[in-house]
């Protein structure tokens, strides 16, 4: 089972779009994918047409379990309307988790334990991270084989990337192995100087970690979200979906190389 976290400490860079679109493409390849919404705003859950206030359980309940195993974790999972795609939804109560958990030991590995228990149930897990460093982001990163960092191709997004990289450096100190990172340029508009220069700067500063291509601006992403569908199901031939197909192939090759 491959676990990817989609993270950036700046909002509006395409985290949820990246998560849903990749999940749609993975499910179309007949692979089982579990989505985990760790953001109290529950954007991923809402995208997939779930109202977390109306659900019997959410990710928050994972942190209330006395024992974490397959039998206790599976009730937190909801099936989406799409084949091979399930979700552990978020709830606004996640915003209180840092205060509720306090300094309890081992809380940074709860999600990893839960996903380890589900290892034979899914081929991929995609974790949509919150924009702030706290218990949930720590859990997501600790559980991940790779961190995908969407970065809007504009100057301010570069600042957000710098903060994210500092966060990863801090967390690296408690890991025995380095984070595998892939920076994903998003919302690219080749007509604008800002996009052109930002993409160039990304490739110069993070040459070995940035995906060489970019996800273009595409209104089909917005239209797909209104229909609560992955863009690959809504407009499979649009340029944005084509970019994510190329990205997924690239990421799969990276995983294969690392396992070789």
Whereabouts are the PLM-identified features?
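P-loop NTP-binding core
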Residues: 1-260
